[in-house]
């Protein structure tokens, strides 16, 4: 185009072509003028390219005494693989990192002041955060000094504290145990005021009484809460106890009181939550005091996550009436740790059933809750979606799906629920899919499959959604098809086909691989198992199950696969098998209490749940759970009595 006599031309491929060539030059070491030394690894690059991407490197290059020579930059605290990821990004604008490497990429981006990359990595970590990992994510965010990331993690912890309290990371945290004696007819104040007084007491114990935080955590501490709302030290109830005052007093005290120089031991909250040395790499800012989240778990029993003098820890607090009506003598503390939940505050009861009986449903864990969607009963395919809270043993409804659907599977991808394919009970198999947005409690259509698909397996792997196998339009034989959905491009593409046709198979992810288990080729049940490697796009047959089955469910627990129930060609079955990938072996486990075919199976926390299904006579709405320690299934649950 030549406006006003000037030639105007825009080459749409120039930038992409040029950056690809630049990256090739970097990898071959041509025209490079900077050497990065990263923990003994040497990397060559071009100063001009790196200076455009990294303000940190720009400052270094700009201060070079010889701007025309070779620059040398040394890093002893970065992961070489992470730096290589950032170099590729600098040359291609594409950020590609294995999930295990994202934290290191974040750290390197922070060092190099690549804020956009740091934010993208932080958002990725948040999308993968759950109740099992949020504590380590908080330690990481605190160590990095990222207030945005830290605030989002803290908000998640506040919402899911009770679920988090059952996880291994929580149990490893250092803990402060408090027994608060109450005068007659006196109740503890609200969480906020209560823990402000507790923090005040901890500070005074450390800086005025000379205690260390580690010493305070070694045994249960006895405090006394009087009728005039004063918190007294239970060990000094002879009238010499210090009264801990208002919030203003607390703030002034923190500002004015300098750290004591003494020989007391220090502790820190490591990434695993264990006690560690003062120079541990993961520690909150020194002298930070903060209540992160708290819950009243029962009458006068409180649970709290807090930062005490920079240490992320747990505070257990139990209030009980004192045998004395006034602090004239020290109350005696039971060695049974009565600050913890008492046995009579736990009740065992049959698990609440779903509102609807359903078979061929989709199930998944999301935010510590069990989601059960769709399915069919004797009358119809369902649109309804139910959500189970394990801590209250209560089912509630979420927004219904747009389309009635059964004989499908559901998966969580980047924090969102996806349902794909299935049958609506009236027409041919479905090609449509939906995504549940919890922010608006509604389902949003996703791009359709290229072919209709029923009885297929669905699973999330490496940030993408896979749909595997399924039945043909006539429902008479299985398929080998495998397709993958990219939530960024919104496109479905094909990947390597299965070795064996199969439908009604169980599908899940474990250790970076995708597993498809059992199913049927036509109507003959299979015991064969295939494993997909996304690195080389191949399916491999591995050890077969002991029992051929279709319509089974699968869940992951402690790094192993548990395949539950199904149909063996004659009957609905209750048997369960466990696969150990390190041994490539299957082992029979404890049976479910009821036969279940086409049931929903999912892991929530450290528990496997089985919901719904068909027992050979009835469509089920019942629930049962698996206890790994006892190798038993039970239709009962224990919940706190409020």
Curated annotation (Swiss-Prot):
Per the UniProt entry, what are the Gene Ontology biological process annotations, in alphabetical order?
Answer: intrinsic apoptotic signaling pathway; mRNA processing; negative regulation of intrinsic apoptotic signaling pathway; negative regulation of protein ubiquitination; proteasome-mediated ubiquitin-dependent protein catabolic process; response to virus; RNA splicing; transcription by RNA polymerase III
Single annotated GO MF: ubiquitin-like ligase-substrate adaptor activity
Q: Which residues form the BTB domain?
A: 1-131
Q: Where is this region: Disordered?
A: 257-281
Annotated GO CC locations: Cul3-RING ubiquitin ligase complex; cytoplasm; cytoskeleton; cytosol; nucleoplasm; spliceosomal complex; transcription regulator complex
Q: Which locations, inside or outside the cell, does it occupy?
A: Cytoplasm; Cytoplasm, Cytoskeleton; Nucleus, Nucleoplasm
Query: Of which family is this protein a member?
Result: Belongs to the BTB-kelch protein family.
Q: How does it assemble?
A: Homodimer; through the BTB domain. Interacts with AHR/Aryl hydrocarbon receptor. Interacts (via BACK domain) with pre-mRNA-binding protein HNRNPK; the interaction is direct. Interacts (via BACK domain) with splicing factor PTBP1; the interaction is direct. Interacts (via Kelch repeats) with RNA polymerase POLR2A (via C-terminal domain). Interacts (via BACK domain) with splicing factor SNRPA; the interaction is indirect. Interacts (via Kelch repeats) with splicing factor SART1. Interacts (via BACK domain) with ALYREF; the interaction is indirect and likely plays a role in mRNA nuclear export.
What is this protein called in UniProt?
Influenza virus NS1A-binding protein
Name the lineage: Eukaryota, Metazoa, Chordata, Craniata, Vertebrata
